[in-house]
A protein has these predicted regions:
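Conserved glycine-rich
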Residues: 163-165
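Conserved catalytic submotifs in the C-terminal HATPase_c
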Residues: 34-38, 56, 61-71
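Short alpha-helical segment of the dimerization/phosphotransfer core of two-component systems
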Residues: 8-13
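Short beta-strand/loop element within the Bergerat-fold HATPase_c
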Residues: 97-109
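Short alpha-helical Gxxx[C/S/T] motif in the catalytic ATP-binding
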Residues: 146, 151, 155
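Short helix-loop "hinge" at the ATP-lid/N-box region of the Bergerat-fold HATPase_c
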Residues: 90-91
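Short conserved segment of the HATPase_c
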Residues: 122-136
Length: 184
């Protein structure tokens, strides 16, 4: 039993250190951005496939209906980090109906990717702070799943390096996180 707890904590610590290193590189501009054209639909499908076991464990229903390729212009590796952080965040906070819906909308040469999860909305006073390093809305609940308040600050650093929009919107039945990418 103790060995499992130690291994679990070591894994959490390892992930946190890796995330901190990545965030540090992003914040200090030491991480090169490699812009390329890639299919965002395929990237999201791949992230969802890699999180299949976690999705099953959380008993979440993930809805992603896009099948046709949608090409965007960005750093594919970094966009994968953004998608992974948003989906992990949704999985950690999904509640009530346990539905996560991912959508891609296209307008004026921009693709907007949204990740919505049912559950409790983020208190309005906390919304501006969720992008800050180590900020946690619910300290007690975050401990349950091992959140460390770094994921959304990584999203912020990546999207700032792209010069593109991102954000979070409360709905009565959950929260929607979004980001935008150029299609040309």
């Amino acid at each position: 039993f103790y060995c499992e707890v130690i291994m679990d904590e070591a894994g959490k610590m390892n992930r946190m250190v890796k995330n901190l290193l990545a965030l540090n590189q992003l914040e200090f501009g030491e991480d090169d951005v490699q812009f390329e054209r890639f299919d965002i639909t395929s990237l999201i499908s791949g992230v969802l496939q890699s999180l299949d076991i976690l999705i099953e464990q959380k008993e979440a229903q993930v809805i992603f209906r896009h099948k046709n390729p949608i090409y965007v212009w960005a750093d594919e590796f970094k966009v994968e980090q953004v998608v992974r952080n948003y989906v992990n965040n949704a999985l950690n906070h999904v509640d009530v109906e346990k539905v996560i819906e991912i959508k891609i909308t296209q307008e004026n040469d921009m693709a907007k990717i949204t990740v919505f999860n049912t559950g409790t909305p983020i208190p309005e006073e906390d919304l501006p702070h969720i992008w800050e390093k180590f900020y946690k809305v619910d300290k007690a609940r975050t401990r349950e799943y091992g959140g460390n308040g770094i994921g959304l600050s990584i999203v912020k650093a990546i999207m700032d390096s792209f010069g593109k929009g991102y954000g979070a919107i409360n709905h009565t039945n959950g929260v929607e996180f979004w980001f935008e990418l150029d299609m040309k």
